[in-house]
Amino acid sequence: MSDDTTQIEPAMAQETSPRANTRKVFVKTYGCQMNVYDSQRMADSLAAEGYVATDTPDDADLVLLNTCHIREKASEKLYSALGRLRKMRDARAADGKELTIGVAGCVAQAEGQEILRRAPNVDLVIGPQTYHRLPNALARVRGGEKVVETDYAIEDKFEHLPAPRREETRKRGVSAFLTVQEGCDKFCTFCVVPYTRGSEVSRSVKQIVAEAERLADSGVRELTLLGQNVNAWHGEGEDGREWGLGELLFRLARIPGIARLRYTTSHPRDMDDSLIAAHRDLRQLMPYLHLPVQSGSDRILKAMNRRHKADEYLRLIERIRNVRPDMALSGDFIVGFPGETDQDFEDTMQLVRDVNYAQAYSFKYSPRPGTPGADLDDHVEEAVKDERLQRLQALLSAQQYAFQDSMIGRKMDVLLEKPGREAGQMVGRSPWLLPVIIDDNKDRVGDIIHVKIVSTGTNSLIAQKLA
């Protein structure tokens, strides 16, 4: 799951006729797709309390920062934002107005009370497993408390979250995220997820199907199933048997209106036979797979506690491509992990050449407090990390552009997602996740049209509609 992008995600769709004194909320989302989903669900719970969204903090009564803790500077980003909000809050106070400030997400979970110590202007700190308690926490804030809600909940948060209103969901678009699994039990030595998101938990089939049906009823055509380790999902199926992610995908594909399915992020250890069979047999499952490996060196993979070897990963890729020859792969890589030698890095470069990725994310290793990796010796010099990252990214970029160029002349179905920048343009999504720009005046958002790719743009494809 990509995790280094800061974005502002509107918390919810604006009600058509908000009440004059309705409270407004602004949510800023940092990081991964699951944080985007969490922001939307927090907004759904606030909508039930009478909040409406605003796309700027300037007129918000409540500002929530939904944070990511994967990368080294996550906390610094948070405190910089809180400093700006403190000035805004002081200006409001001078005019006799109030501003409530909340911190949510994985930095909230990791730092808890420390956030209140460093930023006394914060009113609320709430973790990713407790945001279903947000309305109650805000009521306590209005009563004068400083609230920290980061204890892992005994109750199932998804049972306590209100269903999103149909019109709000419709305004979010024809593609939607749906969290089916949270947490991770793998304990990779570089990763904070087990400490901020907790142990692996799978939502029930009943919950997932009900939410997917609501999304489809609101016009969603494409679902992306989310989880920190999404292919570890398991649960009792409607037939009484234990299901894995493959069986769940087959069930969701039966929902009327759902034309496309994706999932992210996966661990190589949990790619089982039923999931590979789904890639072979399920036409709604798109031929794009994000399957992080992190390194091509067995020695470094062992130090990372990845629980697989490089050749096992390559054999898995071969199995997947044998059943789905048009499968495009993306991945994650860390360079400069403690003890990484020149040969270890060259092993990574060779694995990248062997796989030939359509896209990949790559980062320099940065020690995360509280992880085993932070206690390792033999750290790689920053200059060496920089040089290795530059070389790796050059190779990955060349592969990405080659993949895009390979699309020229191909015919494919494209899901139209939004109007383009130019009059008459539409922007859609290819099966391989690339944006596709089409000059089209007749079709609507949500339609799936057949096109031919005629050229490429920067990280996009240019297409002509076929009759």
From Swiss-Prot:
Enzyme Commission identifier(s): 2.8.4.3
SMART domains reported for this sequence: Elp3 (SM00729)
Annotated binding of [4Fe-4S] cluster 1, by residue: C32, C68, C106
Catalytic activity: N(6)-dimethylallyladenosine(37) in tRNA + (sulfur carrier)-SH + AH2 + 2 S-adenosyl-L-methionine = 2-methylsulfanyl-N(6)-dimethylallyladenosine(37) in tRNA + (sulfur carrier)-H + 5'-deoxyadenosine + L-methionine + A + S-adenosyl-L-homocysteine + 2 H(+)
Top-level taxonomic group: Bacteria
Entry binding sites for [4Fe-4S] cluster 2: C184, C188, C191
Region (Disordered): 1-20
Any one GO molecular function term: metal ion binding
Cofactor, how bound (note): Binds 2 [4Fe-4S] clusters. One cluster is coordinated with 3 cysteines and an exchangeable S-adenosyl-L-methionine.
Subcellular location(s) of the protein: Cytoplasm
Domain TRAM, residue spans: 405-467
Record keyword 4Fe-4S present: yes
Xref: InterPro entries: Elp3/MiaA/NifB-like_rSAM, Methylthiotransferase, Methylthiotransferase_CS, Methylthiotransferase_N, Methylthiotransferase_N_sf, MiaB_methiolase, rSAM, rSAM_horseshoe
UniProt keyword Magnesium, yes or no: no
Cross-referenced PANTHER family: CDK5 REGULATORY SUBUNIT-ASSOCIATED PROTEIN 1, MITOCHONDRIAL TRNA METHYLTHIOTRANSFERASE CDK5RAP1
Family affiliation: Belongs to the methylthiotransferase family. MiaB subfamily.
Designated name of the protein: tRNA-2-methylthio-N(6)-dimethylallyladenosine synthase
Chain's gene name: miaB
